[in-house]
């Protein structure tokens, strides 16, 4: 079907109305890093739709490292975040129990406030994305191909069901494509004499 386009659809008034309607879309993605909550609202049926994801209360180390991280970053602008974290962890271990005590008390106070504000709070860790399975290394592929070749050449050492199918497949393949002397060299020692006599009878 074809739709007849009206020239008024592209007028400034219609374009302004469409832009206002687009701004009223229900989808909203907003993250507040400064507060204690992370809000993520979408117009679909997402798990976080219309719900607030509450952060865990800070522990003593986080309380202490907030100002220390900012201080170290200002003093060392070239230092990466991972290096700053390692340094803060080392400095925290070097503090005495008396120096850590004020931060433990502050963390306990924040935990009590968090409990009163969110009485039904339960910690729900985020699920990590599953990593794709690694491909087999070259050594493993070579080993698998070698085992397949040995199974083709020496099928008599495996189970009876697999041996019969493999042996018949090998005999039909060798009888059509391989000469007699090569096939006799590929067979095990215990079956070489019977195969040679069978070939000799065919020639005579």
Swiss-Prot record:
InterPro entries: HMG_box_dom, HMG_box_dom_sf, SRY, SRY-related_HMG-box_TF-like. GO terms for biological process: cell differentiation; male sex determination; sex differentiation. Residues 54-122 bind DNA. GO terms for molecular function: calmodulin binding; DNA-binding transcription activator activity, RNA polymerase II-specific; RNA polymerase II cis-regulatory region sequence-specific DNA binding. SUPFAM superfamilies: HMG-box (SSF47095). PROSITE patterns: HMG_BOX_2. The keyword Signal does not apply. Residues 175-187 have a biased composition (Polar residues). It is found in: Nucleus speckle; Cytoplasm; Nucleus. It comes from the Eukaryota. Residues 189-204 have a biased composition (Basic and acidic residues). One of its GO terms (cellular component) is cytoplasm. Residues 30-52, 169-204 are annotated as: Disordered. Keywords: Activator, Calmodulin-binding, Cytoplasm, Differentiation, DNA-binding, Nucleus, Sexual differentiation, Transcription, Transcription regulation. Gene3D superfamilies: High mobility group box domain. Belongs to the SRY family. Transcriptional regulator that controls a genetic switch in male development. It is necessary and sufficient for initiating male sex determination by directing the development of supporting cell precursors (pre-Sertoli cells) as Sertoli rather than granulosa cells. Involved in different aspects of gene regulation including promoter activation or repression. Binds to the DNA consensus sequence 5'-[AT]AACAA[AT]-3'. SRY HMG box recognizes DNA by partial intercalation in the minor groove and promotes DNA bending. Also involved in pre-mRNA splicing. Interacts with CALM, EP300, HDAC3, KPNB1, ZNF208 isoform KRAB-O, PARP1, SLC9A3R2 and WT1. The interaction with EP300 modulates its DNA-binding activity. The interaction with KPNB1 is sensitive to dissociation by Ran in the GTP-bound form. Interaction with PARP1 impaired its DNA-binding activity. This is Sex-determining region Y protein. It comes from Eubalaena australis (Southern right whale). The lineage of its organism: Eukaryota, Metazoa, Chordata, Craniata, Vertebrata.
């Amino acid at each position: 079907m074809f739709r007849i386009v009206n020239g008024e659809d592209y007028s400034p008034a219609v374009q302004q109305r469409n832009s206002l309607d687009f701004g009223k879309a229900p989808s909203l993605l907003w993250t507040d890093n400064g507060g204690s909550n992370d809000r993520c609202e979408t117009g679909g049926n997402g798990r976080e739709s219309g719900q607030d994801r509450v952060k865990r209360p800070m522990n003593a180390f986080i309380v202490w490292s907030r100002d220390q991280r900012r201080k170290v970053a200002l003093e060392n602008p070239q230092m990466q975040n991972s290096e700053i974290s390692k340094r803060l962890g080392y400095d925290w271990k070097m503090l005495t129990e008396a120096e850590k005590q004020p931060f433990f008390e502050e963390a306990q106070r924040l935990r009590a406030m968090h409990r009163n504000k969110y009485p039904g709070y339960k910690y729900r860790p985020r699920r990590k994305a599953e990593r794709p399975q690694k491909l087999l290394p070259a050594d493993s592929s070579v080993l698998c191909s070698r085992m397949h070749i040995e199974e083709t050449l020496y099928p008599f050492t495996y189970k009876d069901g697999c041996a019969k199918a493999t042996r018949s497949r090998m005999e039909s393949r060798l009888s059509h494509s391989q000469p007699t002397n090569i096939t006799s060299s590929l067979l095990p020692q215990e079956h070489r004499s019977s195969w040679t006599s069978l070939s000799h009878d065919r020639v005579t």
